[in-house]
Amino acid sequence: FNLKSVYSHLAASEDQRPSQSCDQQIALFEAIKKAHSVQSSSIPKFHLLNSSGVFNYPELQYDMVRCGIAFHGFANHPKWDALLKPIAVLESRITQIHEVKKGSYVGYDHGWKAPVDSIIATLPLGHADGIGRHFGHHKGSVFIHGEEAPIVGNVCMDMLMIDVTNIKCKPQDTVCFFGATYNTAASFSKQGQSISYEILSGLGPRIKRIINE
């Protein structure tokens, strides 16, 4: 058989250099590469670096690199993130708005109790779409007309609720979960103690994809 490529994946490519773990892995990869160059009649392509590796080990690009999250504008380090531009935007629209009296409950398991008379909007995204339950109970928030609205109560399978008491809005108004210029996917994911990889790769198939070239 003809060997086309040999690759590895650094386990801690974003760790500050020098990294003993990465250095050991790189040394082993170099030894394998050298053995192939001596013993093989056809030299396969070698690649080692993911997005973080491209920035942290630019001298090890070999024949190709595997940029994944960097294509979305993230690189796991503030210094590297500053060199990239986030491109992913997740928006939805308000489906319903309800007035909720003080002391009333919202969501499964009475997840949120209105401390005052409130206005609650419903959005048609839930954990089946990749917005996990860990964003509920005021941990996550969205933006309407540039104003921040917290997610209240439990995130449901197909919907979630936000507090818009102090925001002028109506059904069908656009809601931004994360954008390219503010509250990026990295920022939004941190609200739920997650990472941009998880939120971007976990968006469900019901969410319409629009690609702008």
Regions picked out by a protein language model, each given a short descriptive name:
Residues 99-213:
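C-terminal accessory subdomain/extension
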